Amino acid sequence: MQFGKSLLKHVYTRTFKSSLTCSIFAFTLLMIFFVLDWKRMNVYPRLDEIPGLNVLRAWDDLQEITKSPHPYNSHASDVVRNYILEELYKLKKQDEGNVEVIDDLSSTTTFIMPDTNIRSYFEGSNILVRFRGDNERLRPILLSSHFDSVSTGFGATDNGMGVASALELARYYAEHKPERDLIINFNNAEEDYLYGARAFTEHEWSKNVTAFLNLEGAGAGGKALLFRSTNNHVARSYFKSNRFAFASVLGIDAFKRGVIKSETDYVVYEKMNNGTAGLDLAFFRNRGIYHTERDDIQHTSIFSLNHMLVNAFISLRNLLDEKSQHFKGSSPLYFPVFGSYWQINLNLHLFLNVVFLIACPAILFMCLFRFPSLYAQLKKPCYLICFTLSSLFVLIFDYVVVQSLTKLNPYVIHSSPDAVLAFFFLTNLLGLVYSFRYVATHSRMSNEELSCIEIVLIWYVSMFWYISLLIATLTSIVRGLGSLYFVNFGFFCSFFCCILTLIRVRYFVDRMVTINRPANPEQMPLVQSTSGNAYGTSRYPQHRLKAVVSKSASVKLNDNLWSVLFFSCLVPLPLFTCYNLLSEVFIPAVHQSLIDGPYSNTCYKFAVILVFMAIINSSPFVFRALSKKSSAILLMLWVSLLFNILRAEPFNEKAPIKFRVFQHLNLDTSENLFHVQNIEPYTQKVLNDYPKIISDTSYQCVDRDCFYEAEEPTLGFDGPLQNAINITLHKSLNSSLAELRVDAFETKWCYFDFSVPVYVDSINGFEVQEEHQSLRLGVRNFGTPFVVKTVAKDEDSPTNVTVTCMWDEFDHDKIPSYTSLLNYIPAWSVLTKNSTGLLKMSKTHVM
């Protein structure tokens, strides 16, 4: 026992006798937390994780599905559809009684597009399969995945992996009867406007669905993220017994606030049956190759597929095994904490925030009045000035750095997100170090004031987090946000650290200074000086003074120990909570989205503010942890990283720039232009040396659009392209009805835009009877005519209708301008569709 005590004392004195060893200890502690979190981030399920699931078979499905681009408006889509049907019919043959397959060629939907008066009409071509469950009284669960791709991509991640996972789950439940009915919807035309999901809502099977799981791809590869969940009840189905969970509540808030503009089928299903609970499981990384030709089998992995398959299976199993009839609940909140996910009701979370905002400061104030020495130090203006000016300096420094970075190399985060994030951490740490040192030096603090600055700054950090929690709580209540949860960790850690400072002052400081306590308690030192008596010559006997000096000799050792304890409680948890939010979800989701619209440096600002909140807890320790030499090394590292970031190429083969393109041919004027998104100066770098437009006088760039004379498309049409769109008008002699018929060659999409609003009686026999100026029509089969019946309001005033039809197939050189540019562009760039239709041809007719 005595040997153990001696060994512990030896380790204790050796470990905490200097600031350097304390810093090493603190760094080691941070690394332990990082390794714990790294394990959660990088663990993938084994390929044979779930008995009965064959990921190799699913990988074969994926290769079959992604042989070529297969948008809804293509013949390749029919090939993929037939493959899925064949696989499902095999399952039906195994168990005719419990497996039902529907080739849904009858569901038709029409609706008004949100925020517009545009009427959409769509003829669905979904594939539905139903597995009968043991308990017929329980309402069915829906699993959905769309099988169409965009015209410019092979659809490996979006959404081949979702389809392959759904197929493998279908095979599993064909052999393992579920507790309740399972419906799987392999839907078509999601990429155009979620039409497949909308068509499903018209089918009778949709009327009784109680919960759903949607498999999607909003990126290319990586891990499948729980993007959204409607409530905490259904979210538990994802986390229950799931060692491979990967989720963030930030996705819910991003969609809710409109930060993410694109949508998935989730938004259709959640409104089904006046509100249906569900989960949205999607890939989100590598958006630089999302919707491009590099979304193929070569740019993904079987481990990504297996991650989605296993997570989908666990979620679906828990949903099917749920005994309750309804999946009702409140808004969800979930977050990772060092290797595991925590869940809480968002309303309960906000209620507890209000309680903490009232109770915690009350507790601290009541305790503070019992410690006059600490209260006296907190009232000194030098500390408040030091903390406030230093924090303001860091924020101003951050702003200058972000503005400079976005001026000199605005897209650098696209290819170097980790370097930018590391640079922001260094920027904030450097700002804290130099600003605190400068302010403390020029504020003429005494040695005694400098010795207790650590404790005082901990209290000021707690005040900062209290204000942040107040703002975060009010914002969350008003806007229903859950992603501000990281503020709670900062506040709780600082509150707990304040309690520790009271313990230190009460039991480890006040007892040491009772010998020379001044008459006025406010003159009492908060921390004993290491140089002996802080108040001049002692009037006490020499042997008493020696006792005090003997005790003071261990003050530095105790100070170092307390600093490590404070650091361990205050820094790691808030630091890694903010770091996780940035590195796991926010940066991977947005760092390649700057090119999707008008440039904005919002992602830089959000990232640097979050880094500031992660680093601010380190401010009490910068004096002890970093010497002048260490600060100089930190400065050199910052300058080196800045230099590398400024000269880094923002786009490369692994992180290419993505140009939106389309061709428009006006059949009335013969104007034939190919449009390329203008991202200055990179569009010019690609096009200025493009051989086909070097001598093209029509080439010009206006705002966000560059265009030049395009080659005439072929489409495999025999005859002049004028006849590819044939418009005929039949007026009834006995009524005011007029039938507008459009026959378009080999296309399923045509848009009708009238010069004035017209009364639409029906579309392809589907009754509408409303007034509209624009119509969007999608038919089920090639060769089907587009028929719109209208009612004439005034025959003396002619109405013009412009019909625009779309084509997406570019094989066999059908759209030579696209294939030519695709073959020419450098490796650091890719092409993607601008909207529905790589080729748009328009024609105007007078009604």
UniProtKB/Swiss-Prot annotation:
Cofactor note: Binds 2 Zn(2+) ions per subunit.
Enzyme class: hydrolase
Subcellular localization(s) per the UniProt record: Vacuole membrane
Cytoplasmic side: 1-17, 370-381, 437-454, 504-560, 627-630
Residue positions binding Zn(2+) 2: 158, 191, 291
Keywords: Glycoprotein, Hydrolase, Membrane, Metal-binding, Metalloprotease, Protease, Transmembrane, Transmembrane helix, Vacuole, Zinc
Pfam families: Peptidase_M28, PFF1_C
Functional description taken from the UniProt entry: May be involved in vacuolar sorting and osmoregulation.
Name listed for the protein in its UniProt record: Vacuolar membrane protease
Species annotation: Schizosaccharomyces japonicus (strain yFS275 / FY16936)
Taxonomic path: Eukaryota, Fungi, Dikarya, Ascomycota, Taphrinomycotina
